[in-house]
A protein has these predicted regions:
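Glycine/small-residue-rich loop that forms an oxyanion/phosphate-binding "nest" at active or ligand-binding sites
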Residues: 35-89
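Active-site metal-binding motif and surrounding structural segment of the metallo-beta-lactamase
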Residues: 3-50
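Active-site environment of divalent metal-dependent phosphoester hydrolases
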Residues: 30-34, 55-57, 87-88, 111-113, ...
């Protein structure tokens, strides 16, 4: 998690003022992901989109909106995806504006098949690629933590992420951003190569594959005439 000051500085680095933000979408309420939320929401009075269950952990919020399955923020249409993590009511999102769309899914042990159709053939995918299974099993993490990460309420491995992405991407897909890589149980090379091998096996191709880094903003991705700011600050969402 990062402080509100840090998030403000990183936004300003790419020419965005906090006052320009009109919504914060929460994926889940683990403390290390929402560290700066209280100060950020209080200082800038930005509406935070959460579930009623999330509110029990975020009861300090003053300006919040309960998530619906689908809703609009300005000219953006949001589709909410239920994820599976060891935090109550975790969520992912599809953000649509005109003909452009972004999928954002991290911190989940799997993706329910009922969402496959709506997740298919989007322009940009920000997808968790948390760990290499062999590195995790041979690493220093205790057994119970390894089991938690590998469980249906844990995190997507490189293999899982590549499997889902190879089935989701289509002719409209312009970019994949691999996110939430473990610093202890993964490498950028392993995550990238696992995805490339899976795409090659399925005879699919994506021109732009980006590895999101912790504590560093990700490059801007241009979709036709619109710019979407894609930042992966360490566990900031």
């Amino acid at each position: 998690g990062n402080s509100a000051k840090y998030v403000k500085e990183k936004l300003e680095d790419i020419g965005v003022e906090p006052e320009e933000i009109n919504a914060v979408l929460i994926t889940h309420t683990h403390v290390d992901h929402v560290k700066g939320l209280k100060v950020f929401e209080n200082k800038y009075n930005i509406p935070v989109y959460i579930t009623d269950v999330m509110l029990k952990s975020l009861d300090y919020l003053n300006n919040y909106v309960f998530l619906e399955n689908e809703f609009d923020i300005g000219d953006m249409h949001i589709i909410v995806i239920k994820t599976s993590h060891d935090a109550p009511d975790s969520r992912g999102y599809i953000i649509i504006s005109g003909d452009d769309s972004i999928v954002y899914i991290t911190d989940t042990g799997y993706i329910n098949k009922k969402y496959f159709d709506v997740l298919s053939n989007r322009n940009v995918y920000v997808m968790e690629s948390n760990h290499d299974i062999e590195m995790l099993n041979n690493g220093s993490y205790p057994f119970n933590l390894r089991q938690r990460i590998l469980s249906d309420k844990g995190h997507l491995s490189n293999y899982d992420s590549a499997k889902y992405l190879s089935s989701f991407i289509g002719n409209n897909t312009k970019c994949i951003i691999l996110a939430h890589l473990s610093e202890d149980n993964n490498t950028e090379e392993l995550a990238y190569n696992t995805l490339i091998e899976r795409l090659n096996d399925s005879d699919t191709h994506v021109d732009n594959i980006i590895i999101a880094k912790q504590n560093k903003e990700t490059e801007l991705v241009k979709l036709w005439l619109r710019l979407f700011v894609l930042e992966k600050l360490k566990k900031s969402i």
